């Protein structure tokens, strides 16, 4: 048996108003709480630090705008011809070179060499593309890194097709 008895809404409101009756100003309980942005140096003067310097103290959190924009879900990495996909967190990488290194470790056996590694040679014989939010397939590396992290929904690793025309030799 649970000894907890639920209290009615009226008794909760009464208790809330009794607890707040000792304060100087009554609180308005009808409007929602909206955290106010504070400057980085935590004083009340208006600073021109811009959007990057704002932090929100609303719920005991100091969250930078860049941090909020970098929290993205992991994207699916699909290697054409394989039935099992991988997932990778793009916000854990700082550049295309870092992504290329991670992709090489995922899909290339014995991938120890990272000298002069970029997306064009991360996985030999393959091209690295991505799907954006509109399901367009685009070549990875065309956008700045931050924009790529923001719009990439899926990374596709496509095999490079060889010359499909075969010249017949007269022998």
Swiss-Prot record:
Q: Which domain of life is it from?
A: Eukaryota
Q: Got a GO cellular component term for this one?
A: nucleus
Matching entries from InterPro entries are given as:
AUX/IAA_dom, AUX_IAA, PB1-like
PB1 domain segment(s)? 72-162
**Where does the record place the region Disordered?**
1-51
Where does this protein have compositionally biased stretches of type Low complexity? 40-49
- Kindly state the subunit structure of this protein: Homodimers and heterodimers.
Other remarks in the entry: Lacks the EAR-like motif (Domain I) which is one of the conserved features of the Aux/IAA family.
Q: What is known of its domains?
A: The N-terminal half of the protein contains the conserved domain II which is required for the correct degradation of the protein through the SCF-mediated ubiquitin-proteasome pathway. Interactions between Aux/IAA proteins and auxin response factors (ARFs) occur through their C-terminal dimerization domains III and IV.
The protein here is known as Auxin-responsive protein IAA33
Q: Which organism is it from?
A: Arabidopsis thaliana (Mouse-ear cress)
